[in-house]
A protein has these predicted regions:
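Transmembrane alpha-helix signature in integral membrane proteins
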Residues: 4-39
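Amphipathic cytosolic juxtamembrane alpha-helices at the membrane-cytosol interface
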Residues: 13, 17, 43-46, 106-139
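Faces of alpha-helical transmembrane segments in polytopic inner-membrane proteins
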Residues: 22, 29, 51-62, 82-100, ...
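C-terminal transmembrane helix and the adjacent membrane-cytosol boundary/short C-terminal tail
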Residues: 100-109, 115, 121-128, 183-217
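Membrane-interfacial helix termini and adjacent extracytoplasmic/periplasmic loops
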Residues: 44-46, 61-92, 122, 158-161
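Cytoplasmic-entry segments and transmembrane alpha-helices of multi-pass inner-membrane transporters
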Residues: 29-69, 111, 217
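Amphipathic alpha-helical segments that mediate coupling or scaffolding at interfaces
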Residues: 1-2, 15, 36, 40, ...
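Interhelical loop and adjacent transmembrane-helix boundary motif
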Residues: 1-7, 148-205, 217
Length: 217
């Protein structure tokens, strides 16, 4: 029982670490991409936005089967880094759409005003734009975390069962006839997710109080 508990706690830690890394990477990449797209040509902007929908069109099983061979060639199969990479493919579009729309609403006009007042570009971005985008950034962070945390097939296919996450642990019980145990693990999954989202929301609240962010929505 102790060994099983240790494996469970290890799978929880792996899931949370993996999902947090994916969420942070997705949000950062989406933020930088959104800034570039706001300043880009309208045709290029529409083309990139349309291409972001590809992960929603291609079924997960087809994508996982196709990318698995490449992961073996690249030496990323059965490794956490390979799972992070494929999770990014499915979490990044959510972040990109959310942050891009928010960045379009905010624009760079506030940064330009800060430049005129003597602020350096990086100072204007950190102290002006980021506080304005913080609600959407934490929404995107939460969405990416949920997408990664709930992935089963991609994790199983690319991880080869070597990387144990909470979903890999739970799924066999969901398929079994032991509904009581399956329900307990499902509640554990839900509880962990809610706690993490509450932490994200708390950090966002503290930042809003600090920067007195303006709500454009």
């Amino acid at each position: 029982m102790t060994r099983q508990s240790d494996r469970l706690f290890k799978s929880i830690f792996t899931s949370m670490s993996l999902s947090l890394i994916v969420a942070l990477l997705s949000t950062t990449i989406a933020l930088l991409s959104a800034r570039a797209l706001v300043l880009a040509d309208p045709f290029l902007r529409r083309l990139i936005r349309a291409s972001l929908a590809l992960p929603f069109i291609v079924p997960v099983m087809i994508f996982a089967t196709g990318i698995h061979q490449k992961m073996i060639e690249w030496g990323l199969a059965n490794k956490l880094s390979g799972i992070i990479l494929v999770h990014l493919v499915y979490s990044l579009p959510y972040c990109a759409y959310l942050i891009f729309d928010a960045y379009q609403a905010v624009g760079i006009r506030h940064e330009e005003q800060a430049w005129l007042l003597g602020a350096k570009p990086y100072q204007a971005f950190i102290k002006v734009t980021l506080p304005l985008l913080s609600p959407v950034l934490f929404t995107a962070l939460s969405m990416a975390y949920i997408v990664s945390f709930s992935q089963y097939f991609l994790t199983l296919m690319i991880g080869g069962g070597q990387v144990q996450t909470l979903m890999i642990w739970i799924f066999p019980y969901l398929q079994s006839n032991d509904r009581t145990l399956a329900s307990n693990y499902a509640l554990l999954f839900l509880g962990i997710t809610l706690i993490v989202l509450a932490v994200f929301n708390g950090i966002n609240y503290l930042l809003k109080r600090r920067y007195q962010a303006i709500d454009f929505y």
